[in-house]
Amino acid sequence: MRIVNVKDYVIIPLGKQGENLATRVLFPFANEWRLLFGDGTFQLLHQRQSDAEPHAVTVGIDGENVVWNVENVDVAVPGVGKCELNYLVGDALAKSITYSTKTAESLSDVGDTPPEPWESWVDEVLQAGAQAE
């Protein structure tokens, strides 16, 4: 898996259209933002080039990094998009940072059409809820 440390990039290279779980994006802000603002939650929004609205992306924490494992739905549309990492303390937005993203166009058949962005997010929420019971 390709590792992308966002501190090294102005535009985050997400990979090529059709790839799935080939790129792991690391945002090195988890500890820093917790120390500055207190306990909270991270939220990542991603807007592909032709999307009218951003979609929520599942992120995790690994040490001091917020981690985004890029899925095929995130790179289904080639071109330049945007992502925004938000840190919420309660209902308040404590900190936010926005980056440009880049998905390279594939010259070959990109395989199965990925689900809509919200479908995979809803599936993950439902799975987490079932595991919590």
Please report, for each region that a protein language model flagged, where it lies by residue:
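N-terminal assembly/attachment segments of tailed bacteriophage virion structural proteins
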Residues: M1-G111
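Non-transmembrane elongated oligomeric "stalk/shaft" segments that connect baseplates/barrels to distal
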Residues: K95-E133
